Amino acid sequence: MRILYNSRDPQYKTPFGTVRTGQSCFLRIDIPKTCAAVRVTLVAEDCDGKPYREIPFSRAEETADYVLWRTEFTLDRGLYFYWFRVEKPDGSFRLFRQGDGTNMEAGEKWQLSFIPADFSVPDFARGAMMYQILPDRFYQVGQCDLTDKLRPYRIHADKSETPYYTADAEGNWCNDFYGGNLAGICEKLPYLQELGVEVLYLNPIFMAYTNHRYDTADYKRIDPMLGTAEDFSRLCAEAHARGMRVILDGVFSHTGSNSVYFDRNHVFGDGAVSNPASPYRGWYCFRRYPDDYDAWWNMPTLPNVNELAESYMSYIIDDDDSVIAHWVRLGADGFRLDVVDELPDEFVLRFKRRLRELKPDALLLGEVWEDASNKRAYGVSRRYFTDGELDSVMNYPWRNAILRYVKGEDDGTALGQTLETIAENYPPQVLQCLMNCLGTHDTARLLTVFGDDFNGTKAEKAERFLTPEQRKTAIDRLLPALLLQFTLPGMPSVFYGDEVGLQGFEDPFCRRFYPWGREDKSILALYRAVIRLRKESAALRGGELRLRTAGGGRIAYERVCESQTARVFINRSDSIWQLGAEGQPEFSVGLICCGDELALQPNGLCVVFT
């Protein structure tokens, strides 16, 4: 007989997942009578694996075969890992996690986070639909203002051209532009509103040399090719009038070398390189002035900053006209923090507090590629949620699990485990506003991922597109992925152009210009269908997630709220799945109905409401 404990089962642990400080956590463990246990102890370790506290269980009731042991406790705010010690008259053994159950002496430790009692996220972000735009690549209105554009640059004469993937004659990279601007985004707000967008996430708009603009030249100035501060204010005002919020990309771990602050090219006159007495000199770490300095991933165009330098913190966060204050007053509703794992916790927490002072319902999300609840960076356990630093993160573990499942590389069991791990490890309010992205500026285009595993040179990838057969495969995989994206908790995020079938391998090919006039209307129809399904369902937007079945090529789960239950079934197996009498199907592909009985054909899917 096995020892019974499942941290995801309310019989054995409440509350589910994270616990607020001051709130009690209740645990139960069932030990066979044949084990003759005389003492059971929960051993809690801190985030660094050091002993923190031992919590005894009390012998509670008995069943025919088991003794039920219970405990109640609370811990200080923080991230913990725990296991059990079971003592018997003739010795003791340790108990660890194995899947949903337990295992003696080997396995993983359970994770438990105590979060701030007042942890909250903006209401507007819960379940909202996000749309990500790389501003240079979306839409252009009027002529580009090149008067103050940092040089040299290259302008595409044809919006359908492939992004350049080689350096220019002087060895410069990422300096080709298409001319997309803020006025262009503003003009397309009716399209975005009709699509169902509620949050606009803009990749960097600050003045910079490159087209991606992650090499900031001036934090308080719009890149002249994108427009003016007035253009940004107008965009925010019109977006707000249409029920949308606007989130900016904040790049604060490094600046550009060609910037007001560093001025390696001696363009601005008062940077750390061009002026040894520069007020920005203390922001940077020079090993040998002025040419040898600390840079992001050793890229000389991206000098790292010392984020904890008081003058830098004041400039970005605390001053009356700080960078945060400047953009919030112009209309921004929050920030995404680029490479947040390279920003010190003190910086992130101070940023969050100041942002909320300026706009109490502002959103702060971070770029994290792993499970953010237990993320370690440079040997330090990050406190994104245990200190309430972030409201949300980019949900890449979720993305990877969905792609592997839909492509047949993993089964429903693996996907279900990932979904349950995320739900258990993240605070429930964070779960509702996770940035659930299937594609971003840092990944290959979704249609390409689903249709082509080609691994050639950049020159080969530049003009490679799906064949008709590959496209059919990609479309067959796209719908189940979209159904998962728009029926699971969080903010489903669409990267501009994915909804109309834009193709491309990794950067820079995933950053083509939006194909206005050449949209794939059949793919757009799929997006509209799942967006409408979510928008019309209270359960799909904000209901509790309950996993029902996960195995083989199949997965089923529920979203439950007071007024409605939505049941989602996806069958990626090669056999018919008998569902029984589940309710009224509202959305389906490959559904077989026989009276009240439902079944799904191979590669079928459906959503049922009760």
Language model segments and positions:
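Carbohydrate-binding surface patches
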Residues: T14, F26, R548-E582
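Beta-strand-rich binding/interaction modules
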Residues: I29, A36-R53, Y80-Y82, S575-C593
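C-terminal beta-strand-rich structural cap/linker in extracellular carbohydrate-active enzymes
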Residues: I31-K33, Y80, G595-T610
